[in-house]
A protein has these predicted regions:
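Basic, Lys/Arg-enriched alpha-helical interface segments
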Residues: 1-81, 89-96, 103-117
């Protein structure tokens, strides 16, 4: 793997991480519990250490993960009370976080995404 690709990958992961950390801060200020914010942080830390080549690699570690369409994966956390929805580029090892929030917020997100498409 080339230096440029590593640097670019690192930048994407860090920026994604910053978005998650900002969202965690928002959750902490809202009516969500600190336990839920901790779950987001834990998931993010685990993903930084993973190398996924396909959806089967994800399911080896996250049995309840769902493949919504090619490259789109939904993770359930906190006993399915919340969702992390990502786009995975398996060939280059990138994970783009598209949504973090409650199940109700996720339904609204999907409606908005369909309107835009």
């Amino acid at each position: 793997m080339g230096i440029f690709r590593l640097a670019f990958l690192y930048t994407v992961i860090i920026l994604t991480g910053m978005n998650i950390l900002n969202h965690i801060a928002e959750l902490s200020r809202s009516n969500w519990s600190p336990v839920l914010a901790d779950q987001y942080s834990s998931w993010h830390h685990e993903v930084l250490l993973e190398t996924w080549r396909d959806f089967a690699d994800i399911q080896d570690h996250y049995a309840e993960a769902e493949c919504k369409k090619p490259g789109r994966v939904m993770f359930h956390i906190l006993k399915k009370k919340a969702v992390i929805y990502v786009h995975v580029e398996y060939a280059i090892g990138w994970v783009y976080v598209r949504f973090v929030g409650s199940n109700e917020e996720f339904v609204e997100f999907l409606k908005q995404e369909k309107e835009v498409a």
